Amino acid sequence: MSMHDPIADMLTRIRNGQQAKHQQVTLVSSKLKEEIARVLKEEGYIQDFFTETLPNGLKSITLKLKYYHGRPVIEFIKRISRPGLRVYKSYKDLHSIPGFGVAILSTSKGIMTHVSAKVKGVGGEVICEVA
């Protein structure tokens, strides 16, 4: 069975892993997933992540989930732009996310938060929102 939206799958695994109080989640790796994980780590939503090559040649990425006083640090994580409906924003249209959250964007200068994109004056595809 093919997966139509691997980013939505990644976000769902994070959401489900935190609801089940798992310490980590593992999924098939890609450059985009690694960059999203890097932004989540920089923003303090996950403890760490690492990639490894499996014996069958596939790369996997493991995300170490983060909790604060037993509660998940990520209150919500939502896919915005999806294969059937791409969402693009100019840097002028980037607004704050409720609850001190961030939007993660794919821009011409790489994957970054909406705050970084606004400072650099670039817009792009809004991948997801996290708070």
Swiss-Prot record:
GO terms under cellular component: ribonucleoprotein complex; ribosome
Keywords: Ribonucleoprotein, Ribosomal protein, RNA-binding, rRNA-binding
An annotated Gene Ontology molecular function: rRNA binding
Heme keyword on record: no
Record's subunit section: Part of the 30S ribosomal subunit. Contacts proteins S5 and S12.
Role noted for this protein: One of the primary rRNA binding proteins, it binds directly to 16S rRNA central domain where it helps coordinate assembly of the platform of the 30S subunit.
Protein name per its UniProtKB record: Small ribosomal subunit protein uS8
Organism classification: Bacteria, Pseudomonadati, Pseudomonadota, Gammaproteobacteria, Legionellales
